[in-house]
Curated annotation (Swiss-Prot):
Residues involved in UDP-alpha-D-glucuronate binding: 393, 398, 432-433, 460, 492, 526-535, 613
Gene, per the UniProt record: arnA
Signal peptide: none
Native source organism of the sequence: Salmonella schwarzengrund (strain CVM19633)
Keyword Zinc: no
Site, Raises pKa of active site His: residue positions: 140
Subunit structure of this chain's protein: Homohexamer, formed by a dimer of trimers.
Function: Bifunctional enzyme that catalyzes the oxidative decarboxylation of UDP-glucuronic acid (UDP-GlcUA) to UDP-4-keto-arabinose (UDP-Ara4O) and the addition of a formyl group to UDP-4-amino-4-deoxy-L-arabinose (UDP-L-Ara4N) to form UDP-L-4-formamido-arabinose (UDP-L-Ara4FN). The modified arabinose is attached to lipid A and is required for resistance to polymyxin and cationic antimicrobial peptides.
Protein name: Bifunctional polymyxin resistance protein ArnA
């Protein structure tokens, strides 16, 4: 049986050797070039392949059509991935008749995602393992072929557990690969209800919070001990790293972060003390705890965990145009929760952001982007990141006011984009799921799906094509003039402060707000064309967290990217949304203050939206880019979002006025 292998790290070396030992022919190995900035303590797959005389490649993008074609020419019967760091495209996964299989360092479905080795230690688990599973489009979600458990000892640290997992992986592969070679491949579906997902860990995640329980701090030390970057703290401005520790149950009543003693070096936590066995000051050498205390000048009673002063470091300035809107006001709240962000905003109203107006890091001007061009240009020049969120984005307006949609959504925003080009500012631009139009793909891929719209005599598409054209202009500015940009495409975000009931009264609102108005006023819920159109509804909290991570842009991974932000698991028809909303309404404590339910009413889209409207049967995102670039996964169930949105609107109604 001919195999193509994708592999890296020690696990990759173990996997390659196990495949050879099982009698497979390896046609080629794909790996990664080592990163000079990374501590490469592990074995080299490329060196092993060269020694074995196997062709080895390290492409920047293995999913590029050129490499897909080359892999297809190899005609693999089976594909294996052993700690290869990039997701493989569906085109590659489908090249092998027997399938593609990945070795994951946990007992799936627990600890999907990245760095499971470190996360199980952070969380104080007593057991983990390795799992061989079939690869599908969604990372780590395919059927399980085989797994092997590994006990985690109390004295295990990241490196010792890594060695245990490598040994377990080799044992697992030695037992299952010969069976698979004969065509007998077990397949056990994963229980999605048991799935957990963890994202990438960064060196800065090793900062110790002494207010945590001592077991939590000790587990962090274990999880990132050498050769990982280490858990660290500060004595004033001096950073130091803790490489090994033990738990002491008695903190002697000291405040968290207080040095209890220097020989041995013990520091108080929330419910005990951490004894520092070995550590390192700055870039110095590793020494025992008492010597570390001497090097740092610690004395009993000193307080740790005081990061270096940042008064000289300027905060990141974020300009949000349309700051009073649904996304704008929620994003403002998220940014102001972080000390290193300052928000400048403009909008034609301030009702949704009134809670921020006195905040020292929030600067607001009431104005219209069509008029206040000088203010906007000045603040584009002044700020670091620009989010032009102003747009007409309610379907009924596409047929009512198509020219106004074009003027605002395209022309006014193009001017802002040109300011960003002129002053070389990063722009995070809200594209839309509407750009996919009537795409027939099962899920919409940012980089591959066709953008399909209706004929010119259907003005309903003016919003979609305005946004799409601006997407293309931004992309061209990035390619030709170096504009730093990220395009994000929200898929039906919902939550408190979405539109208003007054907007719903004139038909200029999103679907759920209109449905809530029907319930509040006791009018029939109108199901446009029967309400069978399917959408994927996303909680605003999930959406904003993804958008915040785009702004943070860790490792510049979002530069030049288009990122869908939606929840594929929350797919429902408008009729199903209405039914769920009605159920929540009937259970709400304020239900008795509102009229009886007036029933459902099926209406034609033309009678509701007017001439020139077309609807879309389904709209489901692929979120692989979001997972890869943001380490993000939506987690909030649709029912929770519906209940919270409903509660917000019901409590905004003047019950006393209604009763009178």
């Amino acid at each position: 049986m001919k195999a193509v292998i994708f592999a890296y790290h020690d696990m990759g070396c173990q996997g390659v050797q196990a495949v050879l030992d099982a009698g497979y022919e390896i046609a080629a190995i794909f790996t990664h070039a080592d990163n000079p900035a990374e501590n490469t303590f592990f074995g080299s797959v490329s060196r092993l392949a060269a020694e074995l005389g196997i062709p080895v490649y390290a492409p920047d993008n293995v999913n590029h059509p050129i490499w897909v074609d080359r892999i297809a020419e190899l005609a693999p019967d089976i594909i294996f991935s052993f700690y290869y760091r990039n997701l493989l495209s569906e085109e590659i996964l489908h090249l092998a008749p027997a399938g593609a299989f990945n070795l994951h360092g946990s007992l799936l479905p627990a600890y999907r995602g990245r760095a499971p080795l470190n996360w199980v230690l952070v969380n104080g688990e007593s057991e983990t393992g390795v799992t061989l599973h079939r690869m599908v489009k969604r990372a780590d979600a395919g059927e399980i072929v085989a797994s092997q458990r590994v006990a985690i000892a109390q004295d295990d640290v990241a490196l010792t557990l890594h060695h245990k997992l490598c040994q377990a992986a080799r044992q697992l592969l030695n037992s299952i690969l010969p069976t698979m070679k004969c065509g007998d491949i077990p397949s056990v579906p994963q229980r999605e209800s048991d799935a957990t997902y963890y994202g990438r860990r960064r060196p800065e995640d090793g900062l110790i919070d002494w207010h945590k329980p001592v077991s939590t701090v000790h587990n962090l030390v274990r999880a990132v001990a050498a050769p990982w970057p280490g858990a660290f703290s500060y004595n004033g401005s001096q950073k130091f790293t803790i490489w090994s520790s033990r738990i002491c149950p008695d903190a002697q009543g000291a405040l968290p972060g207080s040095v209890i003693s220097v020989s041995p070096l013990r520091v108080a936590c929330a419910d005990g003390a951490l004894e520092i066995i070995t550590g390192q000051a700055g870039d110095g050498i590793t020494v025992q705890g008492s010597q570390l205390a001497q090097t740092l000048g610690l004395v009993a009673g000193a307080r740790l965990n005081r990061p270096p002063a940042t008064s000289g470091k300027r905060r990141i300035r974020v300009l949000i145009l349309g700051v009073n809107g649904f996304i704008g006001n929620h994003l403002t709240e998220r940014l102001l929760n972080e000390e290193n962000y300052e928000v400048y905003g403009m909008d034609i109203g301030s009702n949704a952001i009134s809670r921020f107006l006195l905040h020292p890091r929030f600067h607001f001007v009431e104005g219209d982007i069509s008029i206040h061009s000088e203010w906007i240009e000045y603040h584009v020049k002044k700020c670091d990141v620009v989010l032009p969120l102003v747009a007409i984005a309610t379907p009924i307006e596409y047929t009512r006011n198509p020219l106004r949609v074009f003027e605002l959504d395209f022309e006014e925003n193009l001017r802002i984009i040109r300011y960003c080009v002129k002053y070389r500012k990063r722009v995070v631009f809200p594209s839309t799921s509407e750009v996919y139009g009537m795409c027939t793909d099962a899920s919409f891929d940012e980089d591959k799906s066709n953008l399909i719209v209706g004929p010119v005599n259907k003005p309903r598409w003016i919003y979609s094509v305005s946004k799409q054209l601006l997407d293309r202009v931004i992309w061209a500015y990035g390619e030709k003039e170096g504009l730093r940009f990220t395009l994000f495409r929200p898929f039906n975000w919902m939550g408190p402060r979405l539109d208003s009931l007054n907007a719903a009264r004139i038909g200029s609102s999103r679907a759920i707000t209109q449905l809530i108005l029907n319930l509040v006023e006791g009018t029939p819920i109108k199901l446009i064309d029967g309400g069978q159109q399917k959408r994927c509804f996303t909680d605003i909290r999930d959406g904003i967290e993804a958008l915040f991570r785009i702004i943070v842009n860790d490792g510049d991974r979002c530069d030049g990217k288009i990122i869908n932000i939606g929840n594929p698991d929350n797919e429902a028809s408008i009729q199903e949304l209405a039914t769920l909303l009605l159920d929540s309404f009937d259970k709400h404590p304020l239900r008795c203050h509102f009229p009886p339910f007036a029933g459902f009413q099926v209406v034609e889209s033309r009678s509701y939206y007017g001439k020139g409207y077309q609807d879309v049967a389904h709209r489901k995102p692929s979120i692989d880019n979001a997972r890869r670039c943001l380490d993000w996964e939506p987690s909030i169930a649709m029912r929770d979002t519906v209940e919270e949105t409903l509660d917000f609107f019901l409590r905004s109604v003047d019950i006393a006025e209604r009763a009178s």
